[in-house]
């Protein structure tokens, strides 16, 4: 892949896993495996549509051959400790952003009126910052389902910061990333509308 192709893939390839969609959202929030399966299909379809629309809107990538960099062989005694250290760094990176945005969300709740803290707009605000906090604050209703689909498409600022921290150590930029996630959130909302009569009759 070229650098430009990698940056275009970033616009739609960073998505929630099926375990979160089926378990936390479907079974946990809506108490329905059908709702979880619907959210999963909506999530995947919105990502693919966002990718197609993004690539269609951008100029074509010039075809050509790219130099192949062969990986330097490492001895097991050096590769194994490095792998463990890199895994720990990745876990700490994820945990740090999750904790930061969760605390930030709770601080916001502390200063907001109590009536707003239990409302759908508040859940959307929490989900904009940190996905899990927002999803778990949603009501089990049609509006909650639509909001859940949109938040899953967006991903949350916590996830975006995790992605940007990884990109900082690579030659890739995030020029298409946030636009792609915003588009995916909108498409997720639109794709969730036809599912409402079947899930919430």
Predicted stretch roles:
Residues 80, 84-152:
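Transmembrane helical segments that form the transport core of multi-pass membrane transport proteins
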Residues 27-36, 142, 197-201:
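Helix-coil boundary and interhelical linker segments in multi-pass alpha-helical membrane proteins
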Residues 19, 48, 144-201:
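C-terminal transmembrane helix pair
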Residues 74, 85, 90-91, 110, ...:
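Charge-biased, low-complexity intrinsically disordered regions
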Residues 1-12, 37-39, 147-148, 172-182:
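Membrane-interface alpha-helices at helix entry/exit sites of multi-pass transporters
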Residues 10-11, 19-29, 132-140, 161-168:
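Generic transmembrane alpha-helix signature in multi-pass membrane proteins
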Residues 59-85:
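Intrinsically disordered, low-complexity non-transmembrane regions of multi-pass membrane transporters
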Residues 35-51:
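Alpha-helical transmembrane segments
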């Amino acid at each position: 892949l070229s650098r430009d192709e990698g940056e275009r893939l970033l616009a739609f390839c960073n998505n929630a896993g099926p375990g979160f969609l089926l378990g936390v959202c479907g079974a946990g929030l809506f108490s329905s495996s059908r709702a979880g399966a619907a959210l999963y299909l909506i999530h995947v379809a919105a990502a693919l549509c966002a990718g197609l629309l993004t690539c269609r809107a951008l100029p074509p990538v010039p075809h050509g051959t790219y130099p192949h960099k062969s990986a330097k062989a490492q001895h097991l005694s050096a590769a194994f400790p490095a792998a463990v250290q890199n895994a720990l760094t990745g876990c700490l990176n994820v945990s740090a952003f999750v904790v930061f945005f969760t605390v930030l969300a709770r601080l916001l709740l502390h200063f907001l009126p109590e009536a707003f803290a239990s409302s759908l707009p508040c859940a959307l605000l929490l989900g904009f910052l940190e996905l899990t906090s927002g999803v778990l604050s949603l009501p089990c209703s049609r509006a909650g389902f639509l909001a859940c689909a949109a938040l899953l498409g967006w991903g949350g600022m916590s996830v975006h910061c995790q992605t940007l921290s990884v990109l900082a150590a690579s030659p890739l930029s995030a020029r298409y990333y946030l636009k792609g996630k915003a588009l995916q959130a909108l498409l997720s909302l639109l794709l969730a509308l036809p599912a409402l009569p079947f899930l919430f009759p």
